[in-house]
């Protein structure tokens, strides 16, 4: 029976992992077993944090909107409620951008939200 030689396949597999581990410290970028564990952990964390990043940014936007809304005499929830009632189609990312870069425009949006809510 013919012998199966796996030298090229095994080398390619190991080189792929070591290439992914480039920049890791110490044996985590030099030795295959340690590098393989660290690469798997890094990929798992990257997958997990791509999802938490979305939650973190939404929280940041809400904090920024709330801070600017309170200078206009509204709470965050009342601002959002007023915008929904006024059919203003601005999402939280846009509102946060306005709050940071253009407070005058945000004040106008807050005025629209105030007028849409009954007192």
From Swiss-Prot:
Family annotation (SUPFAM superfamilies): Ribosomal protein L20 (SSF74731)
GO biological process, alphabetically ordered: ribosomal large subunit assembly; translation
A GO CC term assigned to this protein in UniProt: cytosolic large ribosomal subunit
InterPro entries: Ribosomal_bL20, RIBOSOMAL_L20_CS, Ribosomal_protein_bL20_C
Molecular function (Gene Ontology), one example: rRNA binding
Pfam families per UniProt: Ribosomal_L20
Keywords: Ribonucleoprotein, Ribosomal protein, RNA-binding, rRNA-binding
Superkingdom per UniProt: Bacteria
Bilayer-spanning residue ranges: none
Function: Binds directly to 23S ribosomal RNA and is necessary for the in vitro assembly process of the 50S ribosomal subunit. It is not involved in the protein synthesizing functions of that subunit.
HAMAP family per UniProt: Ribosomal_bL20 (MF_00382)
Family: Belongs to the bacterial ribosomal protein bL20 family.
Protein's name according to its UniProt entry: Large ribosomal subunit protein bL20
Organism: Gloeobacter violaceus (strain ATCC 29082 / PCC 7421)
